[in-house]
């Protein structure tokens, strides 16, 4: 049987570069398991933090290394290798390794800007090769918090109160800014969260409890993005549900996250011992069933495909279930919620990876 060549695309320019490498290592291992190694051949392609795509031999070294950042530093100083990749081009960042032409299906385990925002998906679509995950539209909507919320509103999914802010409202007119802050205080009250609309890794996000903190947070967020979203804070359980499929997606059991930090930021997410995962979530069957239903609705609302993790708030005092966000390319590390939820739902990791590849092939064939 001819093996399918899987291009594992990892690394990238975002703040979640290291998480991507960790996820790629686990996926690469899954592709070598007994049930997969007869079907798939791995072609790893590593994208450095500076955007340079590396050939598969060096990319495999990154996957095998316990200290990939040291390998990257060495390789950035390797003039001969980088020169050979450019093939006399004025911009090495536009060069794709020759092994990419051999790929039958891509698995882009990339996060954040230029990874899960539709840009890499557009490139892969131009290659006319199947790829795991959402397409250009679903990825872009899943990354942009404002577009995402508009889609959720249109689908009738309840959310926390929010207000959209632009950089020009913050920086261009000193008379407008105080009125803007007044409106936020009146509409959302404290505490509230200030977030750049189109960044991952919790970059630029702040929880604010006063006027001075609000002003500082808005100014900081505007330095990252020209569009900002401010959300009302809510005291609630934080629940997550994994979704798998294309046009008829299915939802996993529901998980719950607890932590001691001020909010679920990057450090809390990815530092061992900072957060506790409860699978299944400590909620009633009725609440879990409703969340699973809402998760698939959210998946379809943004035109996602393949996979997504959907996050919720459950306000126990009122019984409200509020959708928070969708992540169209969640982490695949050993401590990531997405694969753990499917494992608990009866789909082991190796089977999950196989299913995602098959879903990519199915979507491409239609």
Curated annotation (Swiss-Prot):
Top enzyme class, one word, equals: ligase
Q: What EC identifiers does the entry list?
A: 6.3.2.4
Any one Gene Ontology MF annotation carried by this entry is: D-alanine-D-alanine ligase activity
* Gene Ontology CC, one term: cytosol
Q: Where in the cell is it found?
A: Cytoplasm
Please report the stretch or stretches of sequence annotated as the ATP-grasp domain: 149-358
PROSITE patterns for this protein: ATP_GRASP, DALA_DALA_LIGASE_1, DALA_DALA_LIGASE_2
List, alphabetically, the InterPro entries matched: ATP-grasp, ATP_grasp_subdomain_1, D-Ala_lig_Van_CS, D_ala_D_ala, Dala_Dala_lig_C, Dala_Dala_lig_N, PreATP-grasp_dom_sf
Q: Give the metabolic or biological pathway.
A: Cell wall biogenesis; peptidoglycan biosynthesis
Positions binding Mg(2+) 2 in this chain are 325, 327
- Catalytically driven reaction(s): 2 D-alanine + ATP = D-alanyl-D-alanine + ADP + phosphate + H(+)
Q: Which UniProt keywords apply?
A: ATP-binding, Cell shape, Cell wall biogenesis/degradation, Cytoplasm, Ligase, Magnesium, Manganese, Metal-binding, Nucleotide-binding, Peptidoglycan synthesis
Cofactor(s) recorded for this entry are:
Mg(2+); Mn(2+)
- Similarity comment: Belongs to the D-alanine--D-alanine ligase family.
**Functional summary from the UniProt entry:** Cell wall formation.
The protein, known as: D-alanine--D-alanine ligase
**Species of provenance:** Trichodesmium erythraeum (strain IMS101)
């Amino acid at each position: 049987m001819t093996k399918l060549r899987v291009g594992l695309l990892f690394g990238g320019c975002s703040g979640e570069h290291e998480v991507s490498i960790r996820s790629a290592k686990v996926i690469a291992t899954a592709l070598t398991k007994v049930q997969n190694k007869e079907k798939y051949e791995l072609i790893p392609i590593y994208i450095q933090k500076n955007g340079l795509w590396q050939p598969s031999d060096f990319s495999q070294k990154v996957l095998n290394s316990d200290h990939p950042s040291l390998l990257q530093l060495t390789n950035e100083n390797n003039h001969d290798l980088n020169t050979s990749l450019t093939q006399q081009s004025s911009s090495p960042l536009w060069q794709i390794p020759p092994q990419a032409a051999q790929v039958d299906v891509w698995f882009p385990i990339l996060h954040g800007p230029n990874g899960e925002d539709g840009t890499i998906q557009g490139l892969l679509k131009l290659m006319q090769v199947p790829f795991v995950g959402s397409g250009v539209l679903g990825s872009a909507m899943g990354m942009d918090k404002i577009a995402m919320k508009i889609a959720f509103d249109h689908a009738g999914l309840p959310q926390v109160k929010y207000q959209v802010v632009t950089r020009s409202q913050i920086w261009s007119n000193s008379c407008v800014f105080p009125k803007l802050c007044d409106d936020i205080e009146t509409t959302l009250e404290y505490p509230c969260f200030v977030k750049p609309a189109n960044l991952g890794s919790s970059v630029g996000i702040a929880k604010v409890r006063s006027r001075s903190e609000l002003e500082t947070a808005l100014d900081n967020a505007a330095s990252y993005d020209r569009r900002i979203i401010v959300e009302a804070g809510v005291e609630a359980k934080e629940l997550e549900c994994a979704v798998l499929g294309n046009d008829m997606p299915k939802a996993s059991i529901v998980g719950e996250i607890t932590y001691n930090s001020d909010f679920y930021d990057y450090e809390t997410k990815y530092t061992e011992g900072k957060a506790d995962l409860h699978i299944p979530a400590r909620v009633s069957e009725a609440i879990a069933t409703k969340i699973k239903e809402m998760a698939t609705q959210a998946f379809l609302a943004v035109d996602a495909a393949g996979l997504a993790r959907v996050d919720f708030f459950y306000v126990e005092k009122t019984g409200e279930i509020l959708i928070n966000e969708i992540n169209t390319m969640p982490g695949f590390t050993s401590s990531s919620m997405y694969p753990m939820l499917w494992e608990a739902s009866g789909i082991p990791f190796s089977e999950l990876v196989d299913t995602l590849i098959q879903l990519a092939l199915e979507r491409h064939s239609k």
